[in-house]
Regions:
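General helical structural elements
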Residues: 45, 68, 76, 87, ...
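Intrinsically disordered, low-complexity regulatory regions of eukaryotic regulatory proteins
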Residues: 72, 87, 103-107
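C-terminal structural segments of small proteins and small subunits
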Residues: 75-95
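Conserved short "hinge" loops at termini or chain/domain junctions
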Residues: 1-63, 95-110
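Mid-chain, well-packed structural core segment of small domains
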Residues: 55-79
Length: 110
């Protein structure tokens, strides 16, 4: 696991996948610092938008792809446009998470 910031880690596999998606092909301390900050922002925003603050971007395919795309936008100075351009994907993730939460509540009420 790679520490992105204190208390937030991602797998080396996900970091490598993000680096590949944004065409980072070299080890540079400043670039890694910027990349990790972008990943941390992305995880925070995606969790917030999904209404699931413990959302696992490693195992949820939609969240994982949203994170990769968010980082791509963010590193290109376009993070403001991300939410608008990915609104259907964000809404789908949120609805799926809310439906799962309702299903869990109904199960525990039985």
């Amino acid at each position: 696991m790679i520490e992105i910031r204190k208390g937030l880690e991602i797998s080396e596999e996900l970091l490598s996948e993000i680096e590949n998606a944004v065409d980072i092909t070299f080890e540079d301390e400043a670039t890694q610092k910027k990349l990790k900050a972008s990943i941390a922002r992305g995880i925070g925003r995606i969790r917030s938008w999904s209404s699931d603050l413990s959302l696992d971007v490693e195992s949820d395919d939609t969240a994982r792809q949203l994170l990769i795309d968010y980082v791509r936008y963010d590193l290109n100075g376009m993070s403001d446009a991300f939410r608008e351009n990915y609104a259907p994907d964000i809404a789908s993730l949120r609805l799926r998470k809310e439906a799962a939460a309702v299903g869990e509540e109904e199960t525990t009420d039985i």
